[in-house]
Amino acid sequence: MGGSRELMRILGLDYGSKTVGVAVSDMLGMTAQRLEIIRRPKENHLRRTFRRIEELAKEYEIESIVLDYPLNMDDSVGDRAEKTLAFKRELEERLNVPVFLVDERLTTVEADEIMAECGIPRSDFGLYVDMIAAEIILQDYLNNMTNTASKVSL
């Protein structure tokens, strides 16, 4: 198999008001696997959230992070997107790794569809949605990286 792809791991995050869904790529940067949901009691209580992300980044030897960017449907930047930008800046400062923003519109809808197909009761969707959304966001990013690399190598 030709081509030399660097071994790297990327963390995918779905940042919400009280949770952060977490996914991680395999070492080849080809597939995303969901990891966990980091929960916090209040929106601005982020100390434990950052500490846990730092632990995961160290454990998985993360080289970059992909973070959801919740633009409005008309492409405008709303309150959630502003909070995500502040979260991004703090991540970059604390972890010293690049953080890439990915348009995450409709990932929750896609996550709901996946859970329904898996037979998860709708009443339990809240237990998994952020983690699955993080996996979708990261997988979309990885797919785009692979497609770009394929086009360049042709």
Annotate each language-model stretch with its function.
Residues 2-11, 18-154:
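Phosphate- and other anionic-substrate recognition elements at nucleic-acid/protein interfaces
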